[in-house]
Amino acid sequence: MTEQAPTRLRAVVFMALLVTALVTTVGYRLAGAENDDIALGPGEVTVQIDIEHSRFLPERLVIAEGTRVRFLVVNGDPIHHEFITGDPEVHRRHAQGTETQHPSIPGEVSVDPNGKAITTFTFEEPGRFEFACHLPRHYEYGMHGEIEVVPTATG
């Protein structure tokens, strides 16, 4: 083996590691951009909202105006939660957090421990909307997120 062989091998290994790091970084950035910049919709879409350790995942959604969203809420916690979305008035009505069960109202659903529930909501106009759990101390603990409704592109 010549003296150049170990040097060449080190150079090849270094380049392979560099390419791997670049591909991983670019892929991560593209995945992040997809989640933050591309709106769901228009039309009808289904979004799964997971509840883990009294947190909503994802915490932020971008949705095109006019989109009807079917929220599948999956509660991985051993306690009750709720999923409420809508304008600030909806959240003011629920701020006391005394309702453990909700009637069939679009954008409002109660979720049993380790259970699943479905609600739908149509986002008619652009703006920022909140989703939250208003059961006692859940909101303060961090159980809320944001939905940004963006205008649909016109051709």
Description of each model-found segment:
Residues E59-I84, A117-E125, F129, V149-P151:
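Beta-strand cores of secreted/periplasmic/IMS beta-sandwich domains, seen most often
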Residues E89-E99, G155:
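Short aromatic-acidic-glycine turn motif
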Residues V23-L30, E34, R55, P106-G155:
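Extracellular/periplasmic metallocenter environments
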Residues I38-V69:
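N-terminal edge beta-strand
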Residues H81, H94, H138:
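Histidine-centered active-site/metal-ligand motif
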Residues Q4-A16:
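N-terminal Sec-pathway targeting helices
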Residues V13-V26:
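Hydrophobic membrane-insertion alpha-helices, especially the h-region
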Residues V45, T67, I79, G107, ...:
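Residues that flank catalytic or metal-binding motifs in active/ligand-binding sites
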